[in-house]
Amino acid sequence: MTASIVAHLKLARDDFTLDVNLHLPGRGISALFGHSGSGKTSCLRCLAGLERAASAYIEVNGEVWEDSTRGYFQAPHLRPVGYVFQEASLFPHLSVRGNLTFGWRRVAPAERKVSLDQACQLLGIGHLLDRRPATLSGGEAQRVGIARALLSSPRLLLMDEPLAALDSPRKREILPFLERLHDELDIPLIYVSHAQDEVARLADHLVLLEQGRAIASGPIGETLARLDLSLAQGDDAGVVFEGRVVGHDPHYGLLDLRLPGSSGPLLRITHAAQVMGSTLRVKVQARDVSLALAADSASSILNRLPVRVRESCPAANPAHVLVSLDAGGNALLARITRFSADQLGLHTGQILFAQIKSVALLG
């Protein structure tokens, strides 16, 4: 059976109703994304059992945690969940080591998924073990909080805007550690955020919430490229790719990335040498993609890809058009002027060349 997380939740309050049907991958990072008040935290609290929905069915990789039709509700302390809040909320009277081992000692040795040494290595906190929480920076405290959640040996890790209370330098400090959790641990993670840059960098699967409803859910690359969603209308609209390193030009400092799919195109980016076959995540902004009827070999633009027009729609700025493109099975977005669209004779199914002016490496 395919690993998956299923949650059907209905929760009514005086001023808010949550009504979602979630089907998420049972591994990797799934992001719940939306504005404040859209229902992101309510979803997490229901999954953890901290909020009891009027109607609920929750199943995590084959194990039922809640089924209101049968009157079954697994108590919060019995759910194998690690919960990371905006604030680390460490025990102030214990050292970092004491905070980490508090829950870990209560897990049977045979059930432990992560060792103390492994958690310290993953989060880079080995040098903090003898410190008290009051002496930690915000970023250090949050890393300790994440390690503490891991050491409870959860089957599901929930993170509720773990970077929201941190300034930009501390956010940049923690993001690489979250990427390591994704790469090195086989624990599914549901990540709540309203920051699109965090989601683009971390998530494999994206759920867009609006007013208590899940209006979109799918792989992050495809979901970011949907023209019917508000995500495509923002100034930072774009798509995310995970490319495999297939070449390196040390003279010019260029990497060749092969995008997914049997006919996945090649992207060239400026970057130091990487291990051949390794995977890198990149983002291409819609504003950095122009379209042409033919490949221009005289251009200084490195990346010129043959593409097929999927669809187009008006952009938020009435002078522009958003264009959804297929690049060898990969979704790509372009934002061009209406004048340019008319000059190209833009239509569905048309074969064009996408000229990508900039590719941003995430991480």
Swiss-Prot record:
Belongs to the ABC transporter superfamily. Molybdate importer (TC 3.A.1.8) family. SUPFAM superfamilies: MOP-like (SSF50331), P-loop containing nucleoside triphosphate hydrolases (SSF52540). It is a peripheral membrane protein. NCBIfam families: modC_ABC (TIGR02142). It comes from the Bacteria. The keyword Cell membrane applies. This is Molybdenum import ATP-binding protein ModC. The gene is modC. The complex is composed of two ATP-binding proteins (ModC), two transmembrane proteins (ModB) and a solute-binding protein (ModA). Keywords: ATP-binding, Cell inner membrane, Cell membrane, Membrane, Molybdenum, Nucleotide-binding, Translocase, Transport. ATP binds at residues 34-41. It catalyses: molybdate(out) + ATP + H2O = molybdate(in) + ADP + phosphate + H(+). Residues 298-363 form the Mop domain. It is an enzyme of class 7 (translocase). GO terms for molecular function: ABC-type molybdate transporter activity; ATP binding; ATP hydrolysis activity. Its EC number is 7.3.2.5. One of its GO terms (cellular component) is plasma membrane. It is found in: Cell inner membrane. It comes from Pseudomonas putida (strain ATCC 47054 / DSM 6125 / CFBP 8728 / NCIMB 11950 / KT2440). Residues 1-236 form the ABC transporter domain.
